[in-house]
C-alpha cells in the first residue's frame, strides 16, 4: 500500500492525475457485491413475477451502462475506452444475489472504479425494481476482488482464495 495521495496539487487542492506518459497496457478489474432480500422476493425474481419486468436483465444493462459512465460520475476518474464489461449473477437459492462485474480495457489507467460502480448500480437497480414488495433489502459486501495490469501490477482481495 502506498501512503502518497496523487489527486492533490502542490497547493493541496484537487487535481486529475496526469497519465500522459503512462504505458498502454491490458487492464482488468473484477468487483463483487450482494443484495439480501426476503426469500419470496428472490423466488418472484426467478419466476418473472416482478411488475417492473425482468429484474436481472434490466440490472445487467444498468451495470454495463454505469461502467461506461464512470468518468461522468466520479470527478477524478479518467474517461477510459472500455473493451469489455460483463455482469454475472449467482444466488444462494434462499435470499441473496451476488453480482460480479468484470471490466477490461487496453489503456493507460485501470478500471477498478468502473467495476465497482457497475456492481453498485446493478445492485441498486435490483433494489429499485423490487422495492415495492420488499423495502428491507440489504446491499452489502461491495469490494474489488481482483485487478491486473499497469505499474501497480496484480491485486487480489485478501480474503479471496487464489485459484
Swiss-Prot record:
Q: Which residues form a coiled coil?
A: none
**Top enzyme class:** lyase
What are the catalytic residues?
128
Enumerate the Gene3D superfamilies for this protein: Molybdopterin cofactor biosynthesis C (MoaC) domain
Judging by the UniProt lineage, the source's domain of life is Bacteria
Q: Any keyword Lyase?
A: yes
Keywords attached to this Swiss-Prot or TrEMBL record, sorted alphabetically, are: Lyase, Molybdenum cofactor biosynthesis
GO BP, one annotated term: Mo-molybdopterin cofactor biosynthetic process
Q: What is its EC number?
A: 4.6.1.17
Pfam families reported for this sequence: MoaC (PF01967)
What's its catalytic activity? (8S)-3',8-cyclo-7,8-dihydroguanosine 5'-triphosphate = cyclic pyranopterin phosphate + diphosphate
Which residues does the annotation say bind substrate?
A: 76-78, 113-114
For molecular function, the Gene Ontology terms on record are: cyclic pyranopterin monophosphate synthase activity
The protein's annotated pathway: Cofactor biosynthesis; molybdopterin biosynthesis
Q: Which family does it belong to?
A: Belongs to the MoaC family.
* Free-text function comment from the UniProt entry: Catalyzes the conversion of (8S)-3',8-cyclo-7,8-dihydroguanosine 5'-triphosphate to cyclic pyranopterin monophosphate (cPMP).
> Subunit info?
Homohexamer; trimer of dimers.
Stated name of the protein: Cyclic pyranopterin monophosphate synthase
- Report the source organism: Lactiplantibacillus plantarum (strain ATCC BAA-793 / NCIMB 8826 / WCFS1) (Lactobacillus plantarum)
Amino acid at each position: 500500500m502506498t501512503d502518497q495521495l496523487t489527486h492533490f496539487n502542490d497547493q493541496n487542492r484537487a487535481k486529475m492525475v496526469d497519465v500522459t506518459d503512462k504505458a498502454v497496457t491490458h487492464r482488468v478489474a473484477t468487483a463483487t457485491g450482494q443484495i439480501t432480500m426476503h426469500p419470496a422476493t428472490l423466488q418472484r425474481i426467478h419466476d418473472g413475477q416482478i411488475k417492473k419486468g425482468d429484474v436481472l436483465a434490466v440490472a445487467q444493462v444498468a451495470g454495463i451502462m454505469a461502467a461506461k459512465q464512470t468518468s461522468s460520475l466520479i470527478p477524478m476518474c479518467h474517461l477510459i475506452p472500455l473493451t469489455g464489461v460483463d455482469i454475472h449473477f449467482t444466488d444462494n437459492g434462499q435470499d441473496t444475489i451476488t453480482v460480479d462485474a468484470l471490466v477490461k480495457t487496453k489503456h493507460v489507467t485501470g478500471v477498478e472504479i468502473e467495476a465497482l460502480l457497475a456492481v453498485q448500480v446493478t445492485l441498486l437497480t435490483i433494489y429499485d425494481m423490487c422495492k415495492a414488495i420488499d423495502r428491507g433489502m440489504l446491499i452489502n459486501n461491495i469490494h474489488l476482488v481482483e485487478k491486473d495490469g499497469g505499474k501497480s501490477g496484480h491485486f487480489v482481495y485478501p480474503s479471496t482464495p487464489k485459484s
